[in-house]
Amino acid sequence: MSMNSYGHLFRVTTWGESHGPALGATVDGCPPGIDVDAAAIQHWLDRRKPGQNKYTTQRREADEVEILSGVYEGQSTGTPIQLMIRNTDQRSKDYGDIAEKFRPGHADITYWQKYGIRDPRGGGRSSARETAARVAAGGVARLALAALVPAVKITGYMVQMGPHGIDRECFDLAQVDENPFWVPDAKAADEWAAYLDGLRKSGDSVGAVIEVRASGLPAGLGAPIYGKLDTDLAAAMMSINAVKGVEIGDGMAAAALTGSANADEIHMGDNGPEYSSNHAGGILGGISTGQDVIVRFAVKPTSSILTPRATITKAGTPAEIITKGRHDPCVGIRAVPVGEAMMACVVLDHILLQRGQIGGKVGETRGKIG
């Protein structure tokens, strides 16, 4: 297996390279009768596409999605949905110098060691360009969620850029779409702009932390031990290019808490169980509680920088490399809609799994309380 697919019942396979003629996704398992149109998917792709401001790569790609199969008269047929995005602004000549050299921090050397062949143009299959296909697939998942569980809302945002985090006291989701960093803190957005301007001018890059929140989920999604909702969410986020760490709820910070501080106490509300806090990130024992599911992931600094670095060639000789081409000074910015897409795909997958195993209406729990 070459591991280009993810999901159980809602299964996505992505294909294509950064500088190939096209890339895309095959979405298998979308329920029939879902309203699916290219314009709706395009909305999500437009949030990820490059060249929208000075803080992202200046590669100009329209990222226009084409639906090749699985949709008839605007509705899903239950057969595989093939999505394609044509590449139109490749500059393969920018990568001539790295055909024989390995870029530090990139997958060049590991792809070569594994396969004995690699596409050096823009990183080939290992390029973050692959995430456009994920966002397209996530668009299909969002449309299915809107039809099956309209209450579900998925929102991603940046909570840290380099050493600079947001002020949680100023947290305001209404600010997310008002700045180029998808940050829910207006003051932080201004500070980050000045910080990233300095890094851009020096030819350097920086990492980030992205948080993705799914609200309106029913309790009961996920399964014990090996089918945990958080297991699949962690794997989905970890599969995104440049991601080096994933947390659910308080994550690593929970290790510093006492049991009494970490406990999300339960009481009975008018509409069922309610919790005093959400340290667990909406998941207990691998199963959703009905609270917001909260996931964070950290992306490393973009490895494509203008600073000269030591490396070796395929022949093993010492070399120096400066990465040319057009690159993101902070890949975390465009990782926000990618994280949202992965959340949508995993959540829909588990809703379909729950329906298949337990039966009944979507979101209906078997164990009644009160």
UniProtKB/Swiss-Prot annotation:
Tell me one GO biological process term: amino acid biosynthetic process
The record describes how the cofactor is bound as:
Reduced FMN (FMNH(2)).
Q: In which pathway does it act?
A: Metabolic intermediate biosynthesis; chorismate biosynthesis; chorismate from D-erythrose 4-phosphate and phosphoenolpyruvate: step 7/7
Q: Name one Pfam family in it.
A: Chorismate_synt
Task: Cite the entry's keywords alphabetically.
Answer: Amino-acid biosynthesis, Aromatic amino acid biosynthesis, FAD, Flavoprotein, FMN, Lyase, NADP
Q: Which PANTHER family match?
A: CHORISMATE SYNTHASE (PTHR21085:SF0)
Q: What is this protein called?
A: Chorismate synthase
Organism of origin is: Jannaschia sp. (strain CCS1)
